[in-house]
């Protein structure tokens, strides 16, 4: 089985010429990070994977929450900036996610992360100092979810793979006001 784990970002350019370098022959499984993250980026990744697989009946698309890419080494809480004074939190025991990604306000954050969990963030520049103040030595710094991290998690815990992935939405959609 050939699985595609690929890292791209908006900073890599929108032209798409990077796809010319890809050898996609024989790929029969694509794993994408489902967020939390850039709304457009997560949706674009899922659309790319689904579009590629559309004409290839043997190619399956799976998703994993993006914080899975930072898990695997003991008990870890991955914390991100959800904006508007909120944080998103994902808890892991090795390669097992303990529940869904959830939101916490700043006041509740210390109790949202159980004792014995080290804390990392995907948003070091924005919230690293704040997390260091809240968690002290339990805070071990920032990390970036990578395709390699998703690969490690998927291979260690294939049951965690989600068929027909959707982006993680932390807050409900806001409907336009009626005129």
Describe the residue ranges of each PLM region.
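Oxyanion-binding and handling regions
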Residues: 1-16, 24, 61-179
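DPxDG-like acidic metal-binding loop motif
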Residues: 29-60
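Helix-loop module immediately N-terminal to the HCX5R catalytic loop
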Residues: 20
